[in-house]
Amino acid sequence: MKQQIETPERRVLAPIFGVSRLRMATDGDGVTTLVTFVGCPLRCKWCLNNQCHQHIKDIPSAKLYSPRSLYHEVSQDNIYFQMTGGGICFGGGEPLLRYRFIQDFHQLCNGRWKITVETSLNVPGYCLRELLPIVDHWIVDIKDMNPDIYQRYTGNDISPMLKRLDHLAAYREIRKITIRVPHIPDFNTDVDVRASIARLREMGFTDIDEFTYRKPIKP
């Protein structure tokens, strides 16, 4: 029997629980496909994708993809991506934890599609640095810039996020960064949100999306 060679690509597999096609004006420019990874370092109280914390075997829609198998699946919308300037948005979960997968996927795209990443930035620095050269649009959900509010809402320390945010602020292509600042029921106030936005503007961010979280309805 011929031995199967394990290439680097074969070793880069990622659990994905959603591939949502033909999205418009929600995840970046043009028509996009949203790809959502399993796994997240945060435990947000009003998480809208709570399945990202489950094991892949417990998520009916989830399966393991290689960069190439995902590429083949999403290529069916190639004409829409190219006609509208769209592409793929990686979310989750926390997509930066799958930076190697995204790097390999980007090589397969060969620059034809835009790559957008929606992230909390609460990750080690190398996860961000590895993707800075190839991501076309960053969408950052900061939760809140107040450390106490952040800790209560996410269950995590704010420090990693702030360090990564400083790194992004120093990035030469700041226009490619959208910062999402949520009103979080029971956790922050309008005053807190205004304070977060003021601090972000001081850092140099200009594309700021203020919105309101909705509490998930309990069954």
What spans do the regions from the language model cover?
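N-terminal [4Fe-4S]-dependent radical SAM core
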Residues: 1-64, 76-82
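Glycine-rich oxoanion-binding loops at beta->alpha junctions
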Residues: 65, 70
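Conserved AdoMet/S-adenosylmethionine-binding subsite of the radical SAM
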Residues: 71, 75-87, 91-218
